[in-house]
């Protein structure tokens, strides 16, 4: 049984400048500790000459794996503020690396916390957050005479339609949210006078966009 969770919608990168220091925050959805570490290493290779590359990531629906590093910044001023951005927005299966190129002016503990946290927050906002909601795949097959009305009903009800196959009959491949199955099945039965076939498929995730909240 799949469980709902939040994650980052896509990879993104932003740049902020704070008192001549440049902060580059890059965020990416990841599925495992290994993928997260590979992403962190990739950023380190790109920004090998940077003063600091500060990583943070959370893996697992229940936040089973949490890791961050200050990478030489004063303890608690860099990695933890980045991690807290993910936690505050309940985002998992995501990794962030905030790269700093020192500009010659010290920011102080408070300034570092604001800069690293702010860069991570802007990266998350740019990438976007999605709710990963359990959904049910289904294939609905009807005669051509009913195809137009069935398709119109699917569209009018905002049912997620992943594909249509035109063979001897028409097959609509849909992705159903919890609670949609029985009502839709009854509707198709009424439209076709029970002349349809319904095949349930896998339970999968459907991504629903959200905005970063904190």
Show the residue positions of the predicted features:
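Short amphipathic alpha-helices in soluble, non-transmembrane regions
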Residues: 150-155, 183-192
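A common structural junction motif
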Residues: 47-50, 157-162, 189-197
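Terminal, non-globular segments
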Residues: 174-183
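C-terminal regulatory domains involved in ligand/effector binding and gene-expression control
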Residues: 1-76, 181, 197-214
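Short glycine-/aliphatic-rich beta-strand segments at the starts of folded cytosolic domains
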Residues: 128-146, 174
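Short amphipathic alpha-helix segments
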Residues: 141-159
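Interdomain boundary/hinge elements
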Residues: 53-55, 129-137, 164-169, 197-202
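Active-site beta-strand/loop microenvironment that shapes enzyme catalytic pockets
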Residues: 78-126
């Amino acid at each position: 049984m799949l469980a709902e969770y939040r994650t980052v919608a896509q990879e993104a990168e932003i740049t902020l400048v704070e008192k001549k220091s440049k902060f580059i925050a890059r965020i990416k959805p990841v599925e495992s500790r290994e993928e997260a570490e590979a992403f962190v290493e990739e950023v380190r290779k790109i920004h090998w000459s940077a003063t600091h590359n500060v990583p943070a990531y959370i893996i697992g629906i229940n936040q089973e794996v949490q890791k961050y590093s200050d990478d030489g910044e004063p303890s608690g001023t860099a990695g933890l503020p980045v991690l807290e951005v993910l936690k505050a927005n309940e985002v998992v299966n995501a990794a962030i690396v905030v790269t700093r190129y020192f500009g010659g002016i010290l920011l102080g503990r408070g300034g570092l916390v604001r800069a690293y946290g702010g860069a991570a927050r802007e990266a998350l906002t740019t990438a976007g957050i999605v709710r990963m909601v359990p959904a049910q795949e289904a294939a609905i097959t009807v005669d051509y005479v009913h195809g137009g009305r069935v398709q119109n009903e699917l569209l009018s009800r905002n049912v997620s339609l992943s594909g249509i196959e035109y063979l001897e009959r028409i097959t609509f491949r849909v992705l159903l949210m919890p609670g949609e199955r029985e009502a839709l099945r009854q509707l198709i039965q009424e439209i076709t006078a029970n002349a349809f076939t319904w095949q349930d498929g896998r339970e999968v995730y459907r991504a629903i966009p959200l905005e970063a909240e904190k």
